[in-house]
Amino acid sequence: MAKPSAVDQPDGAGLRERKTKTVEEPVKPSATSGDGGAAQTKKKTIGRTPDGTAFTVPHTRDMVSQLLSPSEPKNLSDILVLSIIGLHIVLLYLLPSYFRIPIFAVLFLSWRAAYNIGIGWLLHMQSNHSTMVLWARQTKIFVNPATGKNPHPKLYSFIKRELETKIPEDYSFEDAPIEYNTWLVFRRVVDLILMCDFTSYCLFAIACGSRPAEENFLVLILRWIVGMGLVLFNLWVKLDAHRVVKDFAWYWGDFFYLVDQELTFDGVFEMAPHPMYSVGYAGYYGISLMAASYKVLFISILAHAAQFAFLVLVENPHIEKTYNAPPPRKRVLESHAAAVTANGEEKFSRRSSDSSDMAPPPSPVALPSSTHNLVGVKNLDLHRITDSSVILIQLLFFALTMLTPATPIYQFFFVLNAAVWRLWYSVGIGYILNCQSHRREWTRHFVKFGETKEEAWNQWKGTYHLSMTLCYASFIAAAWKMYTLPENWGYGLAILKHVLGAGLIALQIWTSVSIYESLGEFGWFFGDFFFDEAPKLTYSGIYRFLNNPERVLGLAGVWGAALITSSRAMIFLALLSHTLGIAFIQLVERPHMQKLYGRGLRQDAGLVRSIKRSLPPSFKQLHGSVDRILDESIEFIEEVLDTARPKLAAGVTTFVKDTSELFHKYPARITITRIEPDVAGYDMNDYSLSVDTADCITIKDGAEDKSEVPVFEYGSPIKISWTAPLNHSKKDWVGLYMIGQNPSREVTKVSSWGRWVATNEGSFDSVLSEKGLLTSDTVVSKPDSANASANNSKKSGKSRKKSSAHEVASGQMVFSGDKLWWTQGVFEFRYHHNGKHNVMATSRPFEIRIPKFDDEHIPSHLPPNGGGFMTTAVEQALLPIVQNCFDRDPEISPQTAEEPFGCETESDLKYAKRVVYAVHQMFGIEFATEVVRADGNVQNLAWRHAQVKRREHTYSRSRAMK
């Protein structure tokens, strides 16, 4: 069934599915947007560059049409692409048969690497640093040579002719934004790589193609029919996807600019997540089937896996950053006003683990805290009895499986054990949930003994998690016992069975991960059976396409194991698992969802809607009749079970102890040293670095600090000034390092890990290098010194005229945010020459310190409800530090103790980690990052600190009285 959540957030599940980005900045129209009048402009697609420049996006043709259609104008780049494709085809016929397979395997893998690694790197750099646009600006290839600023006039004319030939309407090379022209050039590179990638793959399949000797004619026909069907389906997916997303998303246009239009996603984007990368590769397996070659199959799987890696590492991060940005933070008054709806109902998440919607710790909570999750390796906590029990049980199953022989009697008991645990996991757990749904039996049991419903919820999570582990551990153990290695891998379908089985197992793992990502911890453990506050449905993630993904895809792995083992016993277990899984959905989950959400339930998911639209009316009527018969049968079974259900008493009592161990990891010292061989032409005395000490703090923790090292507050921006000779390199840069990292004062041998700023704009291929740059190359006067003149005369052989001062270049920059070391210590700045690691100047050392909180001014004996003294004091001390942890950004940094943190706390753990470290150093209390995210503001953190201190004080008094 569809799963409920607090917010119906769009998923961005389809490949290159782009939502419209609203831009509120003033529009700076370019020359291309004014042609044709306002009426005509409305009919055209309007693009918008990152700086707000609007322009008309010309109509472009798809890759295949512009290359192969005779009606499309051709240019030199088209001829180049077609020539390279032709060379591939000629090479196939010229090579000897024994060379064809390895040569074309290498060719295809090379083009695939150019696609996934080459294009992936370019897009990653463009997304994060605008690298390709910076290259275009630095080389000035799009600047009109008539201005005298373009050093490559012939290249300019060539690119202009190439692009204007392909886009005859609504396009002017001189007037188009640099982002759009850069994208057009990038498109031509993509055309070459993609066409050669596909061509080399097809030629590799032809080289490997053969007919098995034992294959009969019927199997041959069936193999080609299925293979052609997959290829045609692949072709339809590509064409339909291009119809929806057009060239803009097909060629990753939003890495360069955005379009102002409503984007609709239907057709193939309703059928599967990331259709271009998932079902869009079905043709690979169709070609493998027609070629009847395992070589083609394995290279297809490798290419498909590389494409998914491209999606995860390149596409998804950009989509999240561009289209799924956190909503604007609500201020205190807005949050209070929106906390209650018009009907007086509080708005809480239903089946979502989003902790930002939780009530603060001091006030009553409607939903359980998600600060200590249970599912996943990253949440493993061996101090928790559930986790330690799960690990011990899995070790026990492993030992029993490995140490016992695979005799029929042991195989029988392993299969029986797996069947019993599957029955418990479906029938037993289903019975508990059904009782909880109708009579709240599980919760009432704990309330009867004075526990809260949160304790009942925690105990239920442990029970369900342990049951699920036992179910699948026993199934895996049974599969291992029933499995035997094939005697001859080349005989029959042994390899194919293992490949398909592994694919089905991977499909179940992916489905489970997708379900957990959509539902969160709350939905994974059926939280709406235990909490009733303001349910709201969500159809994000995998639920956008399927109502019950666990019904089929969620059990694909058990059939994969049955296929690999080829055992009747495993087929029985797979059939039992699937039958019980469907029964659990129909008899337990579906009735509860209907009772809770009623008509709010969606009838058909995206995939079902797409299939129904393609069915004739007669099939639709038959489908409705079958649904009615199934519903009546299920109602009858429910009535029988209700009358015959025995009373089941279930209770589990455990003591939960929450601790965490955090290890502060310092970056590894990687020596990547680049040295400029000749720096003799520069006056070393003209280089200097000075730290602005206006923001230094006075430590009030009682420690004597007799050193003259300036001290800065943790996370506060640090402003520095530099000077250099007028002829200094434009690629100079300043890095921030911890004292002791670099033993040499002449050369830096440790990476700065991104903590550096360029002295001049446009010198490096990254916009991040200029972040923090305030001024550069301001000419100032610097006093001469006798020593400096003497040293300079010895080095350069020249003498400077005697004067009281001479001119040098100067600049200012500020280090803040990710360019700071988020730890305590003593640091220094280093000025480096010409993009290398030669040190030209070093700043005065300075210290980053977090002042210790002084508990002496807090009353030692606080009444039970009198923690306000400590809470207020902690709030005042903590607020400035927390503001620094959030980079003093008004969008996410709290201005008061009551104001909530920005939504970036949820998506980026770095802010929470900074706060955790600061609290630990300031108060001696170590919280988990989940606690910071759940508390949501300084007031709640201060309240939590007061509670911990009160417990410590109570514990100390009880120890003293003994």
UniProtKB/Swiss-Prot annotation:
Residues on Lumenal side: 1-78, 124-188, 238-270, 315-389, 433-465, 510-568
Spans of biased composition, class Low complexity? 781-794
Q: Which cysteines are joined by disulfide bonds?
A: none
What is a single cellular component term in the Gene Ontology annotation?
Answer: perinuclear endoplasmic reticulum
Protein name, entry field: Phosphatidylethanolamine N-methyltransferase
Localization in the cell: Endoplasmic reticulum membrane
Alphabetized InterPro entries for the sequence: Phopholipid_MeTrfase, Phosphatid-EA_MeTrfase_fun
**What ranges does the record give for the region Disordered, renumbered to this chain?**
1-55, 341-370, 780-808
Q: Sum up the protein's function in the record's words.
A: Catalyzes the first step of the methylation pathway of phosphatidylcholine biosynthesis, the SAM-dependent methylation of phosphatidylethanolamine (PE) to phosphatidylmonomethylethanolamine (PMME).
Q: What's in the keyword line of the UniProt record?
A: Endoplasmic reticulum, Lipid biosynthesis, Lipid metabolism, Membrane, Methyltransferase, Phospholipid biosynthesis, Phospholipid metabolism, S-adenosyl-L-methionine, Transferase, Transmembrane, Transmembrane helix
Entry similarity comment: Belongs to the class VI-like SAM-binding methyltransferase superfamily. CHO2 family.
Reactions accelerated catalytically: a 1,2-diacyl-sn-glycero-3-phosphoethanolamine + S-adenosyl-L-methionine = a 1,2-diacyl-sn-glycero-3-phospho-N-methylethanolamine + S-adenosyl-L-homocysteine + H(+)
Q: In which pathway does it act?
A: Phospholipid metabolism; phosphatidylcholine biosynthesis
Q: Which GO terms describe its molecular function?
A: phosphatidylethanolamine N-methyltransferase activity
Q: Which Gene3D superfamilies match?
A: 2.60.40.2840
Q: What is its EC number?
A: 2.1.1.17
Cytoplasmic side stretches: 100-102, 210-216, 292-293, 411, 487-488, 590-962
Domain of life, source organism: Eukaryota
